[in-house]
Amino acid sequence: MFPMVTGFMNYGQQTVRAARYIGQSFMITLSHANRLPVTIQYPYEKLITSERFRGRIHFEFDKCIACEVCVRVCPIDLPVVDWKLETDIRKKQLLNYSIDFGICIFCGNCVEYCPTNCLSMTEEYELSTYDRHELNYNQIALGRLPMSVIDDYTIRTILNSPQITSE
């Protein structure tokens, strides 16, 4: 008879312990319910990129001296620089400059080592397309400045703050 009583007592203790664990986990869940969300609704809300963000490369054709330093420092020899030598003035004349962003790793070496600062990184990071050949930007496409996320009234921008406010 005693083993049966101790079995019921042991069963009761296990039930109380299980109920306590369930209650503790429920309290933890409720404590997280009043916190602000960490995620954002991406297409409609965007984070403002940091100052040193490495996005699409912007190219200024008039500043380039066709020295090809960008090609030499690129780990994958990506920028394509076409030039011809003007013998009368003894200078290189830039004909074409292109970068294929389907291959680019956005390391920023070309921007860092450019002696004339004709290359710069923009805040544009949405380069997706259905055709990979559209990612090959020539000097005209590289010269376009991206539309700023801050000026777009259809997108709510969120500053780099520790917590995101919800509406």
UniProtKB/Swiss-Prot annotation:
The keyword Electron transport does not apply. It is an enzyme of class 7 (translocase). Its EC number is 7.1.1.-. It is found in: Plastid, Chloroplast thylakoid membrane. Residues 55-84, 95-124 form the 4Fe-4S ferredoxin-type domain. It is a peripheral membrane protein. It catalyses: a plastoquinone + NADH + (n+1) H(+)(in) = a plastoquinol + NAD(+) + n H(+)(out); a plastoquinone + NADPH + (n+1) H(+)(in) = a plastoquinol + NADP(+) + n H(+)(out). GO terms for cellular component: chloroplast thylakoid membrane. Binds 2 [4Fe-4S] clusters per subunit. One of its GO terms (biological process) is photosynthesis, light reaction. Its cofactor is [4Fe-4S] cluster. [4Fe-4S] cluster 1 binds at residues 64, 67, 70, 114. One of its GO terms (molecular function) is NADH dehydrogenase (ubiquinone) activity. Keywords: 4Fe-4S, Chloroplast, Iron, Iron-sulfur, Membrane, Metal-binding, NAD, NADP, Plastid, Plastoquinone, Quinone, Repeat, Thylakoid, Translocase. [4Fe-4S] cluster 2 binds at residues 74, 104, 107, 110. NDH shuttles electrons from NAD(P)H:plastoquinone, via FMN and iron-sulfur (Fe-S) centers, to quinones in the photosynthetic chain and possibly in a chloroplast respiratory chain. The immediate electron acceptor for the enzyme in this species is believed to be plastoquinone. Couples the redox reaction to proton translocation, and thus conserves the redox energy in a proton gradient. NCBIfam families: ndhI (TIGR00403), NuoI (TIGR01971), PRK05888.1-3 (NF004537). Belongs to the complex I 23 kDa subunit family. NDH is composed of at least 16 different subunits, 5 of which are encoded in the nucleus. This is NAD(P)H-quinone oxidoreductase subunit I, chloroplastic. The gene is ndhI.
